[in-house]
Amino acid sequence: MSTSSSPYAAFAALLSSAGHSVSPAELHGLLLGRSCAGAGFDADAWLLDAADLLGGEPQDSVRQALIGLQEMVKGELCSEDMAVVLLLPDDETPLAQRAVALGQWCQGFLGGFGLTARDGALSAEAMEVLQDLSAIAQVQSALEESEDGENDYMEVMEYLRVAPLLLFTECAKPAAPAAKPSLH
């Protein structure tokens, strides 16, 4: 698979052509973080947060891509099987660049979660996920171009596909409607 045809590369090219230096990974992390913290899926609120990260109002083509990205995330989080697909460079990209994007994704996620999270207490598991994301964001350059480095990257990526679901389930998933008491 060629790097230029990956969704990540296409989004990066779109952002770059519009004059934005933000990575698609950081934007996707921001969106997923705010969504998992309970921001809901209002497009206008998402576009405001994205504009802050982008450093200004996005052009229409970028705006449409951001709305599409939000629809994709909403579908992933609200489907029965709740599966997250990370917007990261493909496997043909050098490991060092993929590791940097992974760190940017974590930074974006933490920023989005922090923007939106309510003051309620989080479970120990949720706190551990946030601490893990913070640690992953800091070790971007620690992965070496080797089979072990590849394996480490894949393990971290798999963790990041699952960890946000715990936060979404705890902080944002709509509660089942309570049964209405019947009047006798």
Curated annotation (Swiss-Prot):
Any Gene Ontology CC annotation: cytosol
Q: Which domain of life is it from?
A: Bacteria
In terms of InterPro entries, this protein maps to:
YgfB-like (IPR011978), YgfB-like_sf (IPR036255)
Q: Which Pfam families match?
A: UPF0149
Q: What PANTHER family does the record point to?
A: UPF0149 PROTEIN YGFB
The family this protein is said to belong to: Belongs to the UPF0149 family.
Put simply, this protein is called: UPF0149 protein Pmen_0324
Q: What is the lineage of its organism?
A: Bacteria, Pseudomonadati, Pseudomonadota, Gammaproteobacteria, Pseudomonadales
